[in-house]
Amino acid sequence: MWNLLKSELLKLRRCQILLVGLVALALCPLVQYGSQLIVEAEYRNPNYDFSALFENVVWGNTQIFLPISLVMIGGWLIDRESTHDTLKNIMTIPVSMPKMLGAKLLLVGMLAVLLGLYSVGITLITGLTVGLSGLTAEVFFHGGTQIVLAALTTYLVCMPLILIFGQIRGAYLGGSILAFFLGYSMLFFKSGILASIYPFSAALILVGFDMSEYAGTTTSSTPLLAVIGVGIMVLW
């Protein structure tokens, strides 16, 4: 497995599509802070600080930026074997298809955690640059932990999309577009029960994120249902 992971990592290092994830997650805190500057004064948060920025980034990453990035990168890793006609060479080693797909998924999972850490760093730099207040060790640890854990749970939710669209030649771009719509659809689940079951919102609930302010949920979420919602995607 280690040799497979190492070979997949070498492929990823030669892949410019990784820049999609880096740019997307760098844009997230900028977009979230920028939205505070362009909205009308009555809708603006007068107490916008580091805590609010971290929450915004957790929401933005899970709703838009991570689903697009992870499905695109993971789908490309699987798709390239058929596109570049290298699958027949791999099969002669021999390496079973499930083992190869498992190595690719494991790499994307590790990448999700690294992208989460990267997002924490970019969020910190953004907040310091624009002069936000309220940065304490507790705020940084809580916000940073939520960002990284949400990146991992979002990856778990995106696994079926990566597998399905990665094995359909040239379809990983379509899969990333579908991931965007599925992530954005969190806004439409106002019931706490429905939000807990819907995989993308369940990914946030599992890390202790308050959905009421962002999705307008009318009842409290249920962590046990969130485990089921994410578990269904993992066991797909």
PLM-predicted stretches and their roles:
Residues 77-109:
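Helix-loop-helix units of permease transmembrane domains in multi-pass membrane transporters
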Residues 68-82, 87, 158-173, 230-236:
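Transmembrane alpha-helical segments in integral membrane proteins
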Residues 1-25, 170:
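Aromatic- and glycine-rich beta-strand/loop motifs that create alpha-glucan
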Residues 34-54, 176-236:
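Terminal transmembrane helical anchor/hairpin motif
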Residues 78, 87, 122, 126, ...:
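Hydrophobic alpha-helical interface/terminus motif in multipass membrane transporters
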Residues 20-26, 169-187:
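Pore- or pathway-lining transmembrane helices of multi-pass membrane proteins that form conduits
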Residues 26-69, 102-167, 172, 219-225:
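Secretory targeting signals
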Residues 5-12, 100-101, 144, 148:
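Hydrophobic alpha-helical elements at and bordering transmembrane segments
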